[in-house]
């Protein structure tokens, strides 16, 4: 083991550690980080070499964070990344510093966030908040307004999670939606992602995503926003229904085909009895 460690460079160790961290299941970053920390056995190397992995994980997962003094949580995403560990909160028109290890926000500062698209962003943000409140028991959203390649663009991000470590499962829903403000119509592009990890007496992960394309009539802010939210609601309902139906189908067919529900004898095995028989026999022979 020591010989192997000597032959692996620090750069390679960090690369492997970063890979583990970026693939940590939702809600299990700390557990994976602590395991990697023990394996690497070099805190300075881990913090300095894998810092990009911490940031990438939080942005990929749409990690929500509460900023002291403000009511609503904001999502950590690539769209709000200002560099130097600072992120944008468009709703409150501030930027803040984010600690990717502690998952804490600090140093809020005023920030110009809308790029001349304030009414569009606020209209979409208000409607999306209402939608998320209706459809997600623990959901958060952040809406950005940006000019990308000369086109005025609205980007809407949604995150919802349930972390149940005592019941051995964690899960997260993420969706991202974009459209450009280009009358008379614009293409809507969305990506929906579900990731669930179940680890009681086993290790099963569901990782699924779906790409969506649609179009929206671009008129005024209010009417366009209504159409935009309808597209989101329809696509997300359809995706959730499809996932549920596929799960049921897999339970009824695929999983049953993988193993017998009963052994060839057609009777269930009482492992506790077998264990007690074995122990009793060994005691008799002693």
From Swiss-Prot:
Gene3D superfamilies: F-actin capping protein, alpha subunit, F-actin capping protein, beta subunit
BP-aspect Gene Ontology terms: barbed-end actin filament capping; cell junction assembly
Sites bearing N6-acetyllysine, chain numbering: 19, 97
Subcellular location per the Swiss-Prot or TrEMBL entry: Cytoplasm, Cytoskeleton
Keywords, in A-Z order: Acetylation, Actin capping, Actin-binding, Cytoplasm, Cytoskeleton, Phosphoprotein
Molecular function per GO: actin binding
Record PTM Phosphoserine, positions in chain: 9
Pfam family, one: F-actin_cap_A
InterPro entries: CapZ_alpha, CapZ_alpha/beta, CapZ_alpha/beta_2, CapZ_alpha_1, F-actin_cap_asu_CS
Location of N-acetylalanine modifications: 2
Keyword Ion transport listed: no
GO cellular component term of the entry, any: brush border
PROSITE patterns: F_ACTIN_CAPPING_A_1 (PS00748), F_ACTIN_CAPPING_A_2 (PS00749)
Disulfide bonding pattern of the chain: none
Main location: cytoplasm
Phosphoprotein keyword on record: yes
Protein role: F-actin-capping proteins bind in a Ca(2+)-independent manner to the fast growing ends of actin filaments (barbed end) thereby blocking the exchange of subunits at these ends. Unlike other capping proteins (such as gelsolin and severin), these proteins do not sever actin filaments. May play a role in the formation of epithelial cell junctions. Forms, with CAPZB, the barbed end of the fast growing ends of actin filaments in the dynactin complex and stabilizes dynactin structure.
Subunit-structure text: Component of the F-actin capping complex, composed of a heterodimer of an alpha and a beta subunit. Subunit of dynactin, a multiprotein complex part of a tripartite complex with dynein and a adapter, such as BICDL1, BICD2 or HOOK3. The dynactin complex is built around ACTR1A/ACTB filament and consists of an actin-related filament composed of a shoulder domain, a pointed end and a barbed end. Its length is defined by its flexible shoulder domain. The soulder is composed of 2 DCTN1 subunits, 4 DCTN2 and 2 DCTN3.
Family: Belongs to the F-actin-capping protein alpha subunit family.
Protein name, UniProt field: F-actin-capping protein subunit alpha-1
Source organism: Mus musculus
Higher taxonomy: Eukaryota, Metazoa, Chordata, Craniata, Vertebrata
Encoding gene, per UniProt annotation: Capza1
């Amino acid at each position: 083991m020591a010989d192997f460690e000597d032959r692996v460079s620090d750069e390679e160790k960090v690369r492997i550690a970063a890979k583990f961290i970026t693939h940590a299941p939702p809600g299990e970053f700390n557990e994976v980080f602590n395991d990697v920390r023990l394996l690497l056995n070099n805190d300075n190397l881990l913090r300095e070499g894998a810092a990009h992995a911490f940031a990438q994980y939080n942005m990929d997962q749409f990690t929500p964070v509460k900023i002291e003094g403000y009511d609503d949580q904001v999502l950590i995403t690539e769209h709000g990344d200002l560099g130097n560990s600072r992120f944008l909160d468009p709703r409150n028109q501030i930027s803040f510093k984010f600690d990717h290890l502690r998952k804490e926000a600090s140093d809020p500062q005023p920030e110009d966030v809308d790029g001349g698209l304030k009414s569009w962003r606020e209209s979409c943000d208000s409607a999306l908040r209402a939608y998320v409140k209706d459809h997600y028991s623990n959901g958060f959203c952040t809406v950005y307004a940006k000019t990308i390649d000369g086109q005025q663009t609205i980007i809407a991000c949604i995150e919802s999670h349930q972390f149940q470590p005592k019941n051995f499962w964690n899960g997260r829903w993420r969706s991202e939606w974009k459209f450009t403000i280009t009358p008379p119509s614009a293409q809507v592009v969305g990506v929906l992602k579900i990731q669930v990890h179940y680890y009681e007496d086993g290790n099963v992960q569901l990782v699924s995503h779906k790409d969506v394309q649609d179009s929206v009539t671009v008129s005024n802010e209010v009417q366009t926003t209504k159409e935009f939210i309808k597209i989101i609601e329809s696509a997300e309902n359809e995706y959730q229904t499809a996932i549920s139906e596929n799960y049921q189908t897999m339970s009824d067919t695929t999983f049953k085909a993988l193993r017998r529900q009963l052994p060839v004898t057609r009777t269930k095995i009482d492992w506790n009895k077998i264990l007690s028989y074995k122990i009793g026999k060994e005691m008799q022979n002693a």
